[in-house]
């Protein structure tokens, strides 16, 4: 693992990395996040009874849309032609709350970690927004990269 920050120039100024000479490869990233909440809030969401509507469906779409706009939200991210983005949301009754998993894929010259992380983050934020009327104490946590494949830096998997 290299310790050099690739987005910094010789004088420490921020710059966008030139990926022009890199090989195109298929790259995949998986990110996750959690929204902890009161058990009653989870029941309301799962029953589809939230006042703002379909929390899970809306959060899924918000995450997908966010992944497609990552380069507009995160400075120095390259715009990517994503070939796949999915957001899965599962109840975790032990939490209690919801687990969000986002997968992003591209065939290109740079990775999709930021797109997966953005999708998971925005899906979690959307869950909070849509259910905050009944539970302002919800907690968003555990946003992290779980796995990535492809590219020069090789593969990564949490715990491996």
Curated annotation (Swiss-Prot):
<dbReference type="GO" id="GO:0006777">
    <property type="term" value="P:Mo-molybdopterin cofactor biosynthetic process"/>
</dbReference>
<protein>
    <recommendedName>
        <fullName>Cyclic pyranopterin monophosphate synthase</fullName>
        <ecNumber>4.6.1.17</ecNumber>
    </recommendedName>
</protein>
<dbReference type="InterPro" id="IPR047594">
    <property type="entry name" value="MoaC_bact/euk"/>
</dbReference>
<dbReference type="GO" id="GO:0061799">
    <property type="term" value="F:cyclic pyranopterin monophosphate synthase activity"/>
</dbReference>
<dbReference type="Pfam" id="PF01967">
    <property type="entry name" value="MoaC"/>
</dbReference>
<keyword id="KW-0456">Lyase</keyword>
<comment type="pathway">
    <text>Cofactor biosynthesis; molybdopterin biosynthesis.</text>
</comment>
<keyword id="KW-0501">Molybdenum cofactor biosynthesis</keyword>
<feature type="active site">
    <location>
        <position position="129"/>
    </location>
</feature>
<feature type="binding site">
    <location>
        <begin position="114"/>
        <end position="115"/>
    </location>
    <ligand>
        <name>substrate</name>
    </ligand>
</feature>
<feature type="binding site">
    <location>
        <begin position="76"/>
        <end position="78"/>
    </location>
    <ligand>
        <name>substrate</name>
    </ligand>
</feature>
<comment type="similarity">
    <text>Belongs to the MoaC family.</text>
</comment>
<dbReference type="InterPro" id="IPR050105">
    <property type="entry name" value="MoCo_biosynth_MoaA/MoaC"/>
</dbReference>
<dbReference type="InterPro" id="IPR023045">
    <property type="entry name" value="MoaC"/>
</dbReference>
<comment type="function">
    <text>Catalyzes the conversion of (8S)-3',8-cyclo-7,8-dihydroguanosine 5'-triphosphate to cyclic pyranopterin monophosphate (cPMP).</text>
</comment>
<dbReference type="InterPro" id="IPR002820">
    <property type="entry name" value="Mopterin_CF_biosynth-C_dom"/>
</dbReference>
<dbReference type="InterPro" id="IPR036522">
    <property type="entry name" value="MoaC_sf"/>
</dbReference>
<comment type="subunit">
    <text>Homohexamer; trimer of dimers.</text>
</comment>
